[in-house]
């Protein structure tokens, strides 16, 4: 009996990592459906206090670090709301606020917090202001931070490993989580506008860029965006990035470090950077489930 209780308990914990679904999907999900973690309630003496500490201490602390280290200022500068020099050492610093918004949204889905909800609104206002008219959103590029040109080059989408699509992926993840938790479209609309641009720039067509994502996550994020919006082009784009992996169509080829050493259907061993691998293969699983493509 004890063994069964332990198995059930850890199974319940595992569900917390799955998508929040406060709002219904527009499209039917894959044949295998996750249980929304909002349907799992913990009332124990171990996890419950830690989840509360996450809400009251960890999330506010993480946002304060963003304030202190200029993460929000970079969006404000890009949006013309303030003057100043771009701060930070990496082209993917924009993802720090996105990741925290995602986590904070999961927290809101479990326990509503009026102050946190309002704070997210203020941060999202900065992010929306930084988005360029055509949907582009990577602050170090918009702010022309050539100090970081080793990452991104001199213009948009110049380098496959620029992390621009990585930034987009985390934006979509945050936007979907926020929409599901609050029903607000403020960040979702930013994500959709960016994703529409990505679908124009990348793909198999003439004049498009025929490259993989460089640093995976946009694959699984596009799959989530598809499930929320019902727009099939996002799933198609996710599948394109998965299948362009390892092909080197435009002469771009990364290494095993980026799981770009061979086409995805030829890969039979997990190699390279663990985070990249986790994101890529999760995206492959999402695409396989949603398309029911048995080749995967």
List each model region and its residues.
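Glycan-recognition and catalytic cores of secretory/periplasmic carbohydrate-active enzymes
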Residues: 25-296
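Bacterial N-terminal signal peptides that target proteins for export
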Residues: 2-10
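C-terminal motif of bacterial Sec signal peptides marking the signal peptidase cleavage site
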Residues: 19-20
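Hydrophobic helical h-region of N-terminal Sec-dependent signal peptides
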Residues: 11-15
């Amino acid at each position: 009996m004890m063994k069964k209780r332990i198995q059930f308990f850890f199974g319940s914990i595992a569900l917390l990592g799955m998508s929040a679904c406060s709002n219904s999907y527009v499209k039917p999900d894959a044949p295998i459906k996750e249980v929304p973690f909002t349907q799992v309630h913990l009332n124990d003496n171990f996890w419950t206090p830690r989840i509360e500490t996450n809400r009251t201490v960890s999330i506010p602390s993480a946002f304060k670090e963003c304030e202190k280290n200029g993460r929000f200022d970079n969006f404000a500068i890009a949006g013309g709301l303030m003057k100043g020099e771009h701060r930070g050492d990496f082209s993917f610093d924009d993802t720090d606020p996105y990741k925290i918004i995602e986590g904070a949204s999961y927290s809101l889905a479990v326990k509503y917090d009026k102050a946190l909800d309002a704070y997210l609104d203020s941060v999202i206002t900065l992010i929306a202001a930084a988005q360029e008219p055509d949907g582009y959103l990577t602050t170090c590029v918009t702010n022309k931070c050539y100090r970081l040109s080793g990452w991104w080059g001199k213009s948009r989408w110049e380098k496959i490993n620029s992390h621009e699509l990585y930034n987009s992926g985390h934006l979509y993840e945050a936007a979907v989580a926020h929409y599901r938790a609050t029903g607000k479209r403020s960040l979702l609309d930013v994500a959709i506008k960016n994703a529409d641009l990505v679908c124009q720039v990348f793909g198999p067509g003439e004049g498009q860029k025929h490259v993989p994502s460089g640093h995976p996550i946009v694959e699984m994020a596009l799959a989530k965006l598809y499930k929320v919006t019902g727009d099939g082009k996002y799933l198609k784009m996710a599948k394109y990035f998965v299948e362009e992996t390892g092909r080197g169509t435009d002469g771009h080829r990364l290494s095993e470090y980026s799981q770009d050493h061979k086409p995805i259907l030829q890969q039979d061993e997990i190699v390279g950077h663990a985070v990249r691998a986790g994101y890529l293969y999760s995206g492959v699983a999402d695409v396989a489930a949603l398309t029911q493509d048995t080749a995967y």
